[in-house]
Amino acid sequence: SVGFKAGVKDYKLTYYTPEYETKDTDILAAFRVTPQPGVPPEEAGAAVAAESSTGTWTTVWTDGLTSLDRYKGRCYNIEPVAGEENQYIAYVAYPLDLFEEGSVTNMFTSIVGNVFGFKALRALRLEDLRIPKSYIKTFEGPPHGIQVERDKLNKYGRPLLGCTIKPKLGLSAKNYGRAVYECLRGGLDFTKDDENVNSQPFMRWRDRFLFCAEALFKAQAETGEIKGHYLNATAGTCEEMIKRAVCARELGAPIVMHDYLTGGFTANTSLAHYCRDNGLLLHIHRAMHAVIDRQKNHGMHFRVLAKALRLSGGDHIHAGTVVGKLEGEREITLGFVDLLRDDFVEKDRSRGIYFTQDWVSLPGVIPVASGGIHVWHMPALTEIFGDDSVLQFGGGTLGHPWGNAPGAVANRVALEACVQARNEGRDLAREGNTIIREASKWSPELAAACEVWKEIKFEFPAMDTL
């Protein structure tokens, strides 16, 4: 007779362990599970734990060669989602030995690699991860972090201002550089390559880098402030990406940029290491995130992608606006903004935070608010995001009726007015419009901007609710 019982078996016999006490070294995951009709939630939760760790669909004799009890993921708790029929939050604990040190790539391959196509589930969404301190310590994280960035730029006590250069595709390198110069000269701290500007026939990367560097130094000399332009180093291969980052460093640029989801975590971590070793700041764009995080019941929540980026490394990351054209519910957005910036974040289900997360002094990432925002949004943005943020106005700068530099002036005046008002103890939420109006009396550039955008709102109901 065979030494083991062959055949298909219930996952829940092995992988559903409600009495399990989670360890400090476990990676904990909260999955939103929608089982197929007739599949009990315990079985669905156990199936997730099994398929994302040691399980397979049938008993195999090689199971006897290792200790499954030591290596298996376990579903240790299941709770129904309030207000949703047939949706459950399944909590799964993974032993740390299942993961390679310092590899976000491996962490995701294990936790979300195969299980999302699983037939017994109608849909599956990873809502949050608790990353244990012992695992965090194997990552280098952001190349510099918030404090070092402020020291490098010598800018304190206010949010930083940015602008994406538009039209995003089609400008020649020289005209592109000119737009960069005008924005920086007018008072912005940063300008940005669009995420899809890499190295196309109308503007090769090296030409763009040269003209942007020239714009940068000219604006710096004239304003006496340190300026930056996010030079997009994203490329088709890791070698080419590093080549671009090296060129940026040689030109004396302070910051480069990467599309971390389309580029991939392996490339991103390599670039982050290069940036740390060579004193470059790293701006991260989240192109492709909505493919992964927009559906409420399937995929991954952005807070997981944000945590992963903090491990992999980046000094800035786009984080929605709460007020512009791109989605973001206020409490939920602030939840993952705290996860990016703070050293310790308490569990708070009302903000979508399923686990207490201790970052053990890993540097923080500055959230970037970008997308459909303009001067009238400034009080709200200053209040919501606070000082450690980058507020990025693309159309809100370049759409100014008098041109780029006046557009930049308008934004800088609005920002300084909001910061001053806040420091004087005024209530930005209530008095925001008044503050902007008062400031526009002594800034014709701001007055013109207020006039253009006074009616524009992007109001749709948000998708991202708890």
Swiss-Prot record:
The keyword Plastid belongs to this UniProt entry's keyword annotation: yes
Keywords: Calvin cycle, Carbon dioxide fixation, Chloroplast, Disulfide bond, Lyase, Magnesium, Metal-binding, Methylation, Monooxygenase, Oxidoreductase, Photorespiration, Photosynthesis, Plastid
Cellular component terms per the entry's GO annotation: chloroplast
InterPro entries in UniProt: RuBisCO (IPR033966), RuBisCo_large_chain_AS (IPR020878), RuBisCO_lsu_C (IPR000685), RuBisCO_lsu_C_sf (IPR036376), RuBisCO_lsu_fd_N (IPR017443), RuBisCO_lsu_N_sf (IPR036422), RuBisCO_lsuI (IPR020888)
Site keyed Transition state stabilizer: positions: K325
Residues annotated for substrate binding in this entry: N114, T164, K168, R286, H318, S370
Residues of the active site: K166 (proton acceptor), H285 (proton acceptor)
Cofactor note text: Binds 1 Mg(2+) ion per subunit.
Superkingdom field: Eukaryota
N6-carboxylysine found at: K192
Cofactor(s) listed: Mg(2+)
GO biological process, one term: photorespiration
Transmembrane segment boundaries: none
Modification comment: The disulfide bond which can form in the large chain dimeric partners within the hexadecamer appears to be associated with oxidative stress and protein turnover.
GO molecular function, a single term: ribulose-bisphosphate carboxylase activity
N6,N6,N6-trimethyllysine: residues carrying this PTM: K5
Catalytic class of the enzyme: lyase
Binding site residues for Mg(2+): K192, D194, E195
Subunit structure: Heterohexadecamer of 8 large chains and 8 small chains; disulfide-linked. The disulfide link is formed within the large subunit homodimers.
Anything else known: The basic functional RuBisCO is composed of a large chain homodimer in a 'head-to-tail' conformation. In form I RuBisCO this homodimer is arranged in a barrel-like tetramer with the small subunits forming a tetrameric 'cap' on each end of the 'barrel'.
Record's function text: RuBisCO catalyzes two reactions: the carboxylation of D-ribulose 1,5-bisphosphate, the primary event in carbon dioxide fixation, as well as the oxidative fragmentation of the pentose substrate in the photorespiration process. Both reactions occur simultaneously and in competition at the same active site.
Family indicated by similarity: Belongs to the RuBisCO large chain family. Type I subfamily.
Protein name, UniProt field: Ribulose bisphosphate carboxylase large chain
The species this protein was found in: Gonopterodendron arboreum
Lineage: Eukaryota, Viridiplantae, Streptophyta, Embryophyta, Tracheophyta
